[in-house]
């Protein structure tokens, strides 16, 4: 199913990337970003960053990056439509 850009933007407006990511990754605020251990790789030193202002995450250990939809698809093994529904429920 194709979703209108306005609808996806509304979900992104209601949910900060850090809010979505922090449900599965422990994040600490560092300046304008949040940092934490990568959900994509076992590590001891945090290499995973989240930037709410730019609406994306990036893992320096694996080069994974994207927005809230990408994160939910990758970490929960969902298709795009399923990720939208999951975030839709979270956004209320």
Can you say where each PLM-predicted feature lies in the sequence?
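N-terminal structured subdomain of primase-like DNA metabolism proteins
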Residues: 1-92
